[in-house]
Amino acid sequence: MSIHIGAKEGQIAETILLPGDPLRAKFIAETFLENPVCYNEVRGMLGYTGTYKGKKISVQGTGMGVPSISIYVNELIRDYGVKNLIRVGTAGGMQEDIKVRDLVLAMSSHTDSAINKVRFNGLDFAPTASFKLLKAAYDTAVEKGYSPKVGSVFTADSFYNDNPEAWKQWAKFGTLAVEMETAALYTLAAKYGVNALTILTISDHLITAEETTSEERQTTFTKMMEVALDAAITL
């Protein structure tokens, strides 16, 4: 048991899916896993372990933002021995050729968070995905007939920005989407020498203003869940 996760030793698999929304964790477990067991309810951040096509898989909610996901990723790796972490989340599209409900595989992440500035004494660190997971997810998505977008994303430290046009500078440099966790996930994976990948569904669009409901975000973005799970069983 760690400070924020109530699981006992051996209850969490080496491969884990990380949705921000704990209710999405519950949906994934109940929809896709065989014999799911809830191992965590601390602070309402639900976590489950079951099997998917014969492989032991866990799914753990992380909450929103760099500080929250950092707590769970640190404890999952350090205290429970997790080796493969796949974030399944939502993002806002920044490019015209990316549509709502498209899949995005985050190859790398920019951020305005100061967390790595502090960690690296003011220097920059480039948080990147594990190629092993990136390739597995890309191949899986293509085999399923999907057309995933692969590229950089922007990890924002705040959801509400006083400068609503700030995202346009990132878009000019080819950034695909904005979310709030990937930079932290990739940095911690590098620190501990484990594998990490973010798979995103575009839930809203900064150019077209199209958006989805909270219920849709919770229960209908199943393509990324299937890609994550089928990629996970190849590891």
From Swiss-Prot:
Residues annotated for a purine D-ribonucleoside binding in this entry: 4, 179-181, 203-204
GO MF, one annotated term: purine-nucleoside phosphorylase activity
The reaction(s) this protein catalyses: a purine D-ribonucleoside + phosphate = a purine nucleobase + alpha-D-ribose 1-phosphate; a purine 2'-deoxy-D-ribonucleoside + phosphate = a purine nucleobase + 2-deoxy-alpha-D-ribose 1-phosphate
Gene3D superfamilies according to UniProt: Nucleoside phosphorylase domain
Keywords: Glycosyltransferase, Transferase
Claim: Transferase is one of the keywords in the record: yes
PROSITE patterns listed in its UniProt record: PNP_UDP_1
Signal peptide from the UniProt entry: none
GO cellular component: cytosol
EC number(s) on file: 2.4.2.1
Disulphide-bridged cysteine pairs: none
UniProt key word Transferase: yes
Record-listed phosphate binding positions: 20, 24, 43, 87-90
Residue(s) at site: Important for catalytic activity: 217
Gene Ontology BP, a term: purine nucleoside catabolic process
Active site: 204 (proton donor)
EC class of the enzyme, as a word: transferase
Subunit structure: Homohexamer; trimer of homodimers.
PANTHER family (alphabetical): FI09636P-RELATED (PTHR43691:SF11), URIDINE PHOSPHORYLASE (PTHR43691)
Family label: Belongs to the PNP/UDP phosphorylase family.
Function: Catalyzes the reversible phosphorolytic breakdown of the N-glycosidic bond in the beta-(deoxy)ribonucleoside molecules, with the formation of the corresponding free purine bases and pentose-1-phosphate.
Protein name per Swiss-Prot or TrEMBL: Purine nucleoside phosphorylase DeoD-type
